[in-house]
């Protein structure tokens, strides 16, 4: 009897593990992770590693297609070294609003593509070991990027990896654009 209960429990857990969200359902997903950012067109720049955190909502439109929108705080920018004398970190922080189409190619695995407006909330520069100050290079207040990614969901946990390809200038007087790779872990709550 004990063996039958164990086998039945394993079978039920595997069914719930591979269950797709029902068509027409909504879910909410808090998520947190790491962003690895850089600025294009900045010679000698290096990645700035930072936090990305927020929430996304998803609507399951069909068995294979869902649409999602979210609000994510993202630390972006870049580091640079000038003539081996000055280390500078450009700290661009954004509130990003990703709007994504998610195509589930197999159960749990989604390919993602969308558009993401971002709103600059901080533009500071830190030079050597001094305190960060407002950056004299004025950042654009709105940033636009194209997010492309993959996610995998298991037991409502979702691991998401995406690249945000900047299509608008990050600053008013340069051609530098944001280039950001993000990895997040979230948990989906059905509504």
Where are these regions (language model features)?
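Outer-membrane beta-barrel channels and translocator barrels
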Residues: 21-23, 60-62, 106, 154-157, ...
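Residues on the lipid-exposed face of transmembrane beta-strands in outer-membrane beta-barrel proteins
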Residues: 30-34, 51-59, 71-73, 97-103, ...
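Predominantly the C-terminal beta-signal and adjacent terminal strand-loop region
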Residues: 70, 76-81, 89, 134-191
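Helix-adjacent hinge/juxtasegments
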Residues: 79-113
């Amino acid at each position: 009897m004990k063996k039958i209960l164990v086998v039945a429990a394993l079978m039920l857990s595997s069914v719930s593990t591979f269950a797709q969200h029902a068509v027409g359902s909504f879910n909410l997903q808090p998520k947190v992770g790491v962003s690895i950012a850089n600025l294009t067109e900045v010679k000698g720049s290096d990645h700035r590693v930072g936090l990305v955190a927020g929430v996304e909502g998803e609507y399951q439109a069909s068995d294979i297609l869902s649409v999602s929108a979210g609000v994510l705080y993202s630390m972006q920018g870049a580091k640079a070294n000038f003539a081996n004398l000055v280390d500078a970190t450009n700290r661009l922080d954004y509130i990003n609003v990703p709007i994504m189409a998610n195509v589930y190619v197999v159960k749990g695995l989604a390919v993602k593509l969308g558009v993401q407006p971002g709103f600059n909330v901080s533009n500071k520069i830190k030079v050597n070991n001094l305190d960060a100050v407002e950056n004299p290079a004025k950042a654009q207040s709105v940033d636009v990027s194209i997010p492309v990614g993959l996610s995998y969901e298991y037991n409502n946990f979702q691991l998401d990896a995406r690249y945000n390809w900047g299509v608008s200038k990050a600053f008013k007087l340069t051609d530098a654009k944001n280039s950001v790779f993000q990895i997040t872990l979230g948990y989906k709550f059905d509504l």
